[in-house]
């Protein structure tokens, strides 16, 4: 049987400070939520092993600072990304209005080989706040924006409750995998000398 190699896929999460980027990443990777997160300084990342159709790969998720003073660091962190996630708070109109700025900044600094077809995914977060009564950005408005940018996949999430987080990241992983060029980057795999099977962490998604 052919050996299974683990491929590295890089995902960047962008959005205004306070929209829940760190919370979403930690909910997906660690199944944890905290109200005590401090603003990300520069950038940080977590990894998660995922599997699609008998292929193992490591999803490297970069959580970047939303403050303007850190945006100059973008070039170093954005380049080599396989998918970009744009996050806004459904209760803060300005965070939604800034999505276009984040998208344009990524395309300028990351310089993808095919910018018109580079995969983005949009997450409208914090739908749990005040039972939805504080919401100012409608799902219809968000979907219309996504459609105008080439039908970007859209998910509404609650990092606090874990709602839709797995489905969103499965779609993100699938888009990242589909964008991976021919010259794939592989991580060294371990040899199972005992002949046992490898644990499967996650299943494929439909997106």
From Swiss-Prot:
It holds the Pfam family Ras. GTP binds at residues 15-22, 63-67, 125-128. Signal peptide: none annotated. A lipid is attached at residues 205, 207 (S-geranylgeranyl cysteine). GO terms for cellular component: plasma membrane; vacuolar membrane. The modification Cysteine methyl ester is found at residue 207. Disulfide bonds: none annotated. GO terms for molecular function: GTP binding; GTPase activity. CDD domains: Rab7. It is found in: Cell membrane. One of its GO terms (biological process) is protein transport. It is a lipid-anchor. Keywords: Cell membrane, GTP-binding, Lipoprotein, Membrane, Methylation, Nucleotide-binding, Prenylation, Protein transport, Transport. PANTHER family: RAB FAMILY, RAS-RELATED PROTEIN RABG3C-RELATED. Protein transport. Probably involved in vesicular traffic. Belongs to the small GTPase superfamily. Rab family. This is Ras-related protein Rab7. It comes from Prunus armeniaca (Apricot).
